[in-house]
């Protein structure tokens, strides 16, 4: 049987491993790109799975003063579409990482959804 000190060291090592995996996952999520679109692709927003916006593209046909409000609405919709996709990818990646840790289904670590 393990001593209390050995069990504490094992718990500390497990916590460090989890922290390292979480840090690795944050780096991975920042490297995965998603694209949100609105207006049939007239406005697109590229973002990382971590939610960092990489770019916005607005079709030239929308660059008219009378289209200003529509462009604003489309940019908002494209941003929200990209954010939703980033959230889904992030949740999938975290679930995959959690599964690789051998944790029981439904057991959620802080920061893992």
Q: Which role does the model predict for each range below?
A:
Residues 11, 51, 75:
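Residue-level signature of catalytic and energy-coupling elements of molecular machines
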Residues 3, 67-74:
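Conserved acidic
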Residues 30-33, 37, 41-42, 64, ...:
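Small cofactor-carrier domains centered on a conserved lysine used for covalent cofactor attachment
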Residues 1-31, 35, 85-113:
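Long amphipathic alpha-helical segments used for membrane anchoring, targeting, substrate engagement
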Residues 37-56:
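N-terminal intrinsically disordered, cationic/polar leader segments
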Residues 74, 78-89:
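Stable alpha-helical structural segments in soluble proteins, enriched in small hydrophobic residues
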Residues 56-68:
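A short interface-forming secondary-structure element
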């Amino acid at each position: 049987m393990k001593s209390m000190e050995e069990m504490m060291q094992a718990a500390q090592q497990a916590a460090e491993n989890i922290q390292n995996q979480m840090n690795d996952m944050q780096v991975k999520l920042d490297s995965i790109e998603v694209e949100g679109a609105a207006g049939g692709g007239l406005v697109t927003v590229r973002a990382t799975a971590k939610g960092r916006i990489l770019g916005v593209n607005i079709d030239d046909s929308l660059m008219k003063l009378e289209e200003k409000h529509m462009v604003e609405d489309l940019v908002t919709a494209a941003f929200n579409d990209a954010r939703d996709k980033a959230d889904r990818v992030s949740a999938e990646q975290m679930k995959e990482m959690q599964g690789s840790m051998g944790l029981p289904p439904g057991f959620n670590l802080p920061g893992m959804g």
